[in-house]
């Protein structure tokens, strides 16, 4: 198991209120600029895996691994648990974004689990993506394997000015370099586990790009880079020449924007 009095002059009251409003607006802009929300992005029910019956061994196994996974401390932002054999085998995997571990990861996990069980009720297989985490429940043992079938893309509606091809090439080079950083053998956390995540910024012409790449922690380093290379080079058509874009699979993902959206990690 990867187991927050009437005697006072009106002018002072107005100044005080204006200051409070200004502070609130500043906080809102700060949070917005770092995209500290946890928006729902996409989900997919894997109908080919079939459904389970209420009270079945499969459901009991699912509830057991949910309890086991929920009891974790979410410090690494990842867990993979499984139980059962044959038609009663079930596995649950979640991966939180690299800046969303501990309590933020737990919050996203709870939200994702509830939503996935509602959206894919009784399905043996299902995947859900949120801004800060990914969750997959499956009846198929697939840890360490690349998933080429379940992916999607989101992009900014605005195009880059100047040469779209030049912008794309610089963006691709930037993301691939982040992929190398994410899969470096030196990229370990304090528990001596591979981080499988990297973020950075780079100037492209007059603009500054902010980006991140990440893999699920069940992958080997080489497999992680292969996944990132695949989505960056093969699955990014919807992002071509766009001022921002994201590509997700169940194995890896990337994102780039013209504004900072990642909370710096310690």
From Swiss-Prot:
CDD domains: Gnk2-like. Disulfide bonds: none annotated. Gene3D superfamilies: Gnk2 domain, C-X8-C-X2-C motif. Belongs to the cysteine-rich repeat secretory protein family. Residues 40-142, 148-261 form the Gnk2-homologous domain. It is found in: Secreted. PROSITE patterns: GNK2 (PS51473). It comes from Arabidopsis thaliana (Mouse-ear cress). PANTHER family: CYSTEINE-RICH REPEAT SECRETORY PROTEIN 29-RELATED (PTHR32411:SF54), CYSTEINE-RICH REPEAT SECRETORY PROTEIN 38-RELATED (PTHR32411). The keyword Transcription does not apply. Keywords: Repeat, Secreted, Signal. Residues 1-33 form the signal peptide. The keyword Signal applies. One of its GO terms (cellular component) is extracellular region. This is Putative cysteine-rich repeat secretory protein 20. The gene is CRRSP20.
């Amino acid at each position: 198991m990867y187991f927050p009095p009437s005697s006072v002059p009106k002018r002072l009251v107005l100044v005080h209120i204006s200051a409070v409003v200004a502070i609130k607006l500043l906080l809102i802009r700060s949070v917005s600029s770092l995209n500290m929300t946890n928006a729902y992005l996409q989900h997919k029910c894997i109908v080919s895996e079939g459904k389970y019956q209420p009270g079945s061994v499969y459901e009991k196994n699912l509830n057991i691994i949910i309890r086991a996974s929920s009891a974790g401390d979410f410090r690494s932002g990842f867990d993979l648990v499984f139980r059962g054999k044959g038609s009663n085998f079930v596995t649950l995997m979640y991966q939180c974004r690299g800046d969303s571990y501990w309590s933020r990861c737990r919050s996203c996990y709870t939200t994702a689990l509830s939503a996935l069980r509602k959206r894919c009720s009784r399905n043996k297989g299902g995947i859900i993506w949120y801004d800060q985490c990914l969750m997959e429940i499956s009846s198929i043992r697939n840890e360490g394997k690349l998933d080429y079938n379940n992916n999607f893309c989101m992009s900014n509606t605005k195009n880059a000015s100047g040469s779209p091809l030049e912008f794309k090439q610089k963006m691709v080079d930037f993301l691939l370099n982040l992929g190398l950083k994410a899969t470096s053998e030196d990229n370990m956390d304090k528990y001596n586990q591979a981080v499988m995540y990297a973020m950075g910024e780079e100037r492209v012409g007059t603009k500054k790009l902010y980006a991140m790449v990440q893999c699920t922690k069940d992958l080997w380093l080489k497999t992680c880079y292969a996944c990132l290379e695949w989505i960056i080079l093969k699955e990014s058509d919807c992002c071509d020449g766009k001022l921002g874009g994201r590509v997700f699979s169940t194995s890896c993902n990337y994102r780039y924007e013209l504004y900072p959206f990642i909370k710096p990690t310690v």
